[in-house]
Amino acid sequence: MLSAARLNRLFLAGELSAVEIAESALSRIAQVEPAVGAFITVAADHVIERAKKLDARRKAGDTELGPLAGVPIAVKDNICTSGMETTCASRILKGYVSPFDATVVERLRAAGAMIIGKANMDEFAMGSSGESSAFGVTRNPWDLERVPGGSSSGSAAAVAAGEAPLALGTDTGGSIRQPAAFTGIVGLKPTYGYVSRYGVVAFASSLDQVGPMGRDVEDVARLFEVIAGPDRRDATNAGRTPPALKFGGEPSLSGVRLGVPKELLGPGIDPGVKARVEEAIAQLEELGATVEECSLPSTEYALSAYYVIAVAEASSNLARFDGVRYGYRAAQAGGLHEMYSKTRGEGFGTEVKRRIMLGTYVLSAGHYDAYYRRAQQVRTLVVRDFERAFERYDALVTPTTPFTAWKIGEKVDDPVSMYLGDICTIPVNLAGLPAVSVPCGFVDGLPVGMQLIGKPFADTQILQIAWAYQKVTKHHEARPALTEEGGR
């Protein structure tokens, strides 16, 4: 699969038709999807129909086809799409078709993109492995016995496996960046409020953000510019448009000051991962950046605070799924309350039920102050740590994850161990900051990601830093050795 930028150029120049591009993507999906499991829905008829319309517009001389015209894209299945199911990878929403498009989907269509399908995910975005989907496990294209990360598991796997050049994911505590790191692609978690959440099924409303995933920084930046911007339908939208990004010339980080939080590059980080990230930091220095060690002392409390705030918001948001208005409804219920109980018990998976119960507990009258209020106080401390760091530094550098992808099933019975894998990404969500994961090497054949964290609304700045790093390295060009049959 060619890059999104190149596909767009070839299509606009008439060297490739949109139908040819769509058919090529569908052929690749047919080859590898049985092994990878990146999609819940493959919208073959839809994408061919869309491609024919784009071809007709180009032949008619339309010069405003858009920066994503002719580009296939996968959309995470918690983002509403009219005409396609939106299941959130849950039995409780199986068969549900939204009557409207999310704002980000509207913008994709306006930019000429071809939505090729809905990507698999952890159920209701609650997970870090891609194993909790009601529609099957997604596998890592680099090692089919390992997880691709989550919760945007299918989005990451689809891009890494060459099924689509771009994908949309959502990130609540690392759900774009962690799978991007595990699968060797680029993933951006934008500043909270930069991208509309209208039409995105909520997990934790104060943490969720939609973002782009792709094989290189230029493609991710192109998609970010399409989806970001004001939206009055989203009360949490910041009403800001990002500055235009221009890549070119010799890569240089002269004058850029980078901080490396000691809490996130010390004990608990796999030695191989640490070595790759330290090599990447040395490369940033060679590009002209000034690098210093810094401290984010409240980081040690971030994980605990997150798993109070996130589950509390989830228990509230998921109360709407009761079997009355839409989605799955349990049969043979003796009354209304039994119908609610059976529907939710049968419709939700284990991880979702675990988080709903925890959220209900921390919001209860006897525990609100001890847990939820205290977690919000810790969140304030995390924000202040970042504010102090950014008084001195332009961006911060950390590993994206403390270890590489684990084997499927390895952590299913130990959710706390899985939660600990988000230690580098969760503080960013608590503070509402932008962060991008870029490939920085391999450990035992498995990809490693470096995370660049920026100031609020400095998304374009961290993308520029990531681009400079990408220009002098080749890690993003590596491809998994999937055969035509989808095996290794």
Curated annotation (Swiss-Prot):
Keyword terms of this UniProt record: ATP-binding, Ligase, Nucleotide-binding, Protein biosynthesis
Any one biological process term the GO annotation gives: translation
PROSITE patterns assigned to the protein according to its UniProt record, in alphabetical order: AMIDASES (PS00571)
EC number: 6.3.5.7
Keyword Nucleotide-binding carried by entry: yes
Statement: the UniProt record of this protein carries the keyword Nucleotidyltransferase: no
Family annotation (Pfam families): Amidase
Superkingdom of source: Bacteria
Active site: K76 (charge relay system), S151 (charge relay system), S175 (acyl-ester intermediate)
Gene Ontology terms: cellular component: glutamyl-tRNA(Gln) amidotransferase complex
MF-aspect GO terms: ATP binding; glutaminyl-tRNA synthase (glutamine-hydrolyzing) activity
Reactions catalysed, as given in the entry: L-glutamyl-tRNA(Gln) + L-glutamine + ATP + H2O = L-glutaminyl-tRNA(Gln) + L-glutamate + ADP + phosphate + H(+)
Gene3D superfamilies, sorted: Amidase signature (AS) domain (3.90.1300.10)
Known role: Allows the formation of correctly charged Gln-tRNA(Gln) through the transamidation of misacylated Glu-tRNA(Gln) in organisms which lack glutaminyl-tRNA synthetase. The reaction takes place in the presence of glutamine and ATP through an activated gamma-phospho-Glu-tRNA(Gln).
Family affiliation: Belongs to the amidase family. GatA subfamily.
Complex formation: Heterotrimer of A, B and C subunits.
Protein name: Glutamyl-tRNA(Gln) amidotransferase subunit A
Organism, scientific name: Symbiobacterium thermophilum (strain DSM 24528 / JCM 14929 / IAM 14863 / T)
Phylogenetic lineage: Bacteria, Bacillati, Bacillota, Clostridia, Eubacteriales
